[in-house]
A protein has these predicted regions:
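Conserved structural motif at the start of ABC-family nucleotide-binding domains
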Residues: 9-11, 24-26
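Helix-to-loop junction immediately C-terminal to a conserved catalytic motif
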Residues: 55
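A short, proline-enriched helix->beta-strand linker immediately N-terminal to the Walker B motif
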Residues: 138-142
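Conserved ABC ATPase "signature" region
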Residues: 98-115, 167
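The feature captures the beta-strand-to-loop junction immediately N-terminal to the Walker
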Residues: 40-42
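Conserved ABC ATPase signature
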Residues: 119-123, 127
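Hydrophobic anchor residue at the start of the ABC signature
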Residues: 133
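Short helical segment in ABC ATPase nucleotide-binding domains corresponding to the A-loop/adjacent helical element
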Residues: 87-95, 100, 206
Length: 237
């Protein structure tokens, strides 16, 4: 597949090995502006490795990777600096005299307008992850790279964060690559699904379900069964 440079992400032949273990064996991946792409695969399939390559955090990978515009990364761990207040964590690295005001605006967007002066240790897990999203949003990224950002949250908080992500995407229109192991999450949020297997993209699925989505909407269960089959997860018949 030829890279299409008009995309937010155009990657071809991405290869990454750790010693004799080849984790990525020639991955081709493309993300359109404003598109949400979910990347799924078994544990150890190389999902997080691929995201790190696309984020520019792995200099030992081979292949061609092109990203256009600004990008931000949200990890499963919020990685907030405990010695800085919440608003200062969000403003960290942001240039300009209005950096703190922009950080405060981003916190308001994620529902934490009143927590700017709090310390990270005073936040719940869900609040900490909201701060991580605010820290990404304040940079006004064209591309958001997310490595299982809701994986450490309880079920209810996870649903709330998924809804927040959908609202933020609607408001800002950024492209996103979402690494997740949650099939329902992928189907609820993504425009397109990629299954990573054997070091390559083994399957691509277009999600034509419309918005807003729910697990009981028509067509959801069919796509869910198909995706679980591709991931080699047994399903009830």
């Amino acid at each position: 597949m030829e890279a299409r440079p008009s995309g937010v992400v155009a990657a071809t032949g991405v290869r990454r090995a750790f010693g004799d273990a080849v984790v990525l064996g020639g991955v081709d991946l493309f993300v359109e502006p404003g598109e949400i792409v979910a990347l799924l695969g078994a544990s150890g399939s190389g999902k997080s490795t691929l995201l790190r390559v696309l984020a520019g955090l792995d200099e030992d990978a081979e292949g061609e990777v092109h990203t256009s515009g600004s990008k931000a990364v949200v990890f499963q761990e919020h990685r907030l600096l405990p010695w800085k207040r919440v608003v200062d964590n969000v403003a960290l690295g942001v240039r300009g005299k209005d950096a703190k005001q922009r950080a405060a605006t981003a916190l308001e967007e994620v529902g934490l307008a009143e927590r700017g002066k709090a310390w990270p240790s005073e936040l719940s897990g869900g609040q900490s992850q909201r701060v991580a999203f605010a820290r990404a949003l304040v940079r006004e990224p064209e591309l958001l790279l997310l490595d299982e950002p809701f994986g450490a949250l309880d079920a209810l908080t996870r649903l709330k964060m998924q809804a927040l992500f959908a609202r933020l995407h609607e408001a800002h229109g950024f492209a996103a690559l979402l690494v997740t192991h949650d099939v329902d999450e992928a189907l609820l949020l993504a425009d397109r699904l990629l299954v990573l297997d054997g070091g390559r993209i083994a399957e691509e699925i277009k999600v034509d379900l419309g918005h807003p989505r729910s697990v009981d909407m028509e067509g959801f269960a069919v796509l869910r069964r198909r995706l679980l089959g591709l991931l080699h997860v047994p399903t009830e018949t």
